């Protein structure tokens, strides 16, 4: 969880340039994403608020989004209350991943009104809520009723309540020496105790504190804690890191000892997030859509394999054409011995010297029986050529779908669309 409370603090600091900016437009390009276009210093800034379970965040994005022709109801509510308004304040609640944006706007008759956007970044429980000046909920993206949530209600008309407090401490209000009071060196991992004690900490930052000293003692822990917390107050250094051993990707706003092999520095936190979440979003979209594609590919592969089996069986049967031709020839050669009504004739196969018994249609004349076998020969000969062509095409289809099945881990959304087409 790289977008922790400390990262949120840095992001809020970087967004202060938007204060006094005018809300020009509001869009909802994706189900869980709102884009607020803020006009400031004669330039438009896209403020992204996402409550995606895996990608929830707040940032300015330079990515271009396609907006639906008919905006969702949630976007319409935001437009009604916020468009044309001015941002008065952007603040973080404590050191948590909760952000509040105060907006001064005007209602339909021109009277001044005050609204607050509340973004709660909590993974799958993330929410986006709009409240009035009395903290009454106007609308929430995720409605929580007393029947579905025992802690609070998020419904229009109800007073806003914050998520249940975990009673954690703000790490910026606690020194390293004071932090010792909450750590038991005999009660398990120090990093986990730090995580459970301090608001806004993530495993990334608690592991960093522990890694700053070879051993954690009553002397080294306060030193490492103060050292890391002091560095979080410096100007941000937006870094992207990929661990080549595990393949895991991370980002943060400062240099970490854990980032040691492949590191890329970006010009801003927003550029960093665009790169990180765009790549992750692509993989997530691929994963979601690939589930259907996997089933489709497997079904097609099975279908083609079954088809090939039937074609091969039919092809083997078509090889019997030479027998049909032989029967026609032998009936013609022995036609003087055959009369209508005979059910079979035994004749000498002049190719092998063996006798052959040939079935006859007793209702037909000897010449009609001979023509029947000649027609069978010609039909099977033509069919054999058709089957040979179909078998080759089917084998190519099997190779095609087999290759797709092997490459699904590296496929893109565009590739999926191409395959579906």
Where are these regions (language model features)?
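Extended, highly charged segments
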Residues: 1-421
């Amino acid at each position: 969880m790289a977008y922790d409370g400390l990262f949120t603090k840095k992001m809020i600091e970087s967004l202060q340039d938007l204060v006094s900016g005018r809300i020009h437009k509001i869009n909802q390009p994706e189900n869980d994403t709102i884009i607020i276009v803020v006009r400031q210093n004669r330039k438009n800034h896209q403020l992204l608020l996402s409550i995606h379970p895996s990608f929830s965040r707040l940032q300015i994005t330079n990515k271009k989004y396609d907006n639906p022709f008919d905006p969702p109801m949630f976007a319409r509510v935001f437009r009604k209350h916020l468009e044309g308004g001015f941002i008065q304040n952007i603040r973080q609640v404590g050191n948590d991943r909760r952000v509040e944006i105060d907006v001064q706007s005007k209602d339909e008759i021109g009277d001044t009104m005050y609204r607050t956007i509340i973004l709660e970044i909590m993974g799958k429980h993330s929410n986006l809520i709009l409240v009035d000046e009395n903290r009454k909920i106007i609308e929430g993206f995720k409605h929580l009723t007393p029947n579905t949530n025992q802690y609070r209600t998020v419904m229009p008309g109800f007073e806003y309540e914050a998520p249940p407090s975990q009673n954690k401490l703000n790490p910026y209000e606690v020194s390293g020496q004071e932090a010792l009071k909450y750590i038991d060196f005999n009660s398990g991992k120090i990093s986990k105790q730090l995580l459970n004690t301090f608001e806004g900490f993530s495993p990334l930052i608690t592991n960093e504190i522990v890694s700053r000293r070879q051993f954690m003692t009553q002397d080294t822990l306060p030193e490492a804690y103060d050292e890391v917390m002091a560095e979080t107050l410096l100007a941000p250094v937006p870094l992207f890191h990929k661990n080549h051993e595990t393949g895991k990707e991370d980002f943060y706003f400062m240099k970490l000892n854990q980032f040691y092999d492949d590191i890329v520095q970006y010009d801003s936190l927003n550029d960093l997030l665009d790169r990180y979440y765009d790549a992750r979003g692509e993989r997530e979209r691929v994963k979601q859509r690939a589930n259907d594609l996997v089933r489709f590919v497997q079904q097609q592969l099975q279908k083609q394999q079954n088809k090939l089996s039937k074609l091969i069986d039919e092809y083997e049967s078509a090889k019997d054409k030479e027998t049909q031709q032989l029967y026609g020839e032998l009936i013609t050669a022995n036609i003087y011995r055959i009369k209508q009504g005979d059910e079979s004739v035994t004749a000498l196969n002049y190719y092998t010297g063996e006798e052959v018994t040939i079935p006859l249609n007793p209702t037909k004349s000897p010449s009609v029986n001979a023509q029947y076998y000649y027609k069978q020969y010609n039909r099977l000969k033509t069919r054999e050529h058709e089957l040979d062509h179909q078998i080759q095409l089917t084998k190519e289809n099997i190779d095609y779908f087999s290759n797709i099945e092997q490459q699904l881990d590296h496929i893109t959304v565009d590739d999926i669309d191409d395959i579906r087409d």
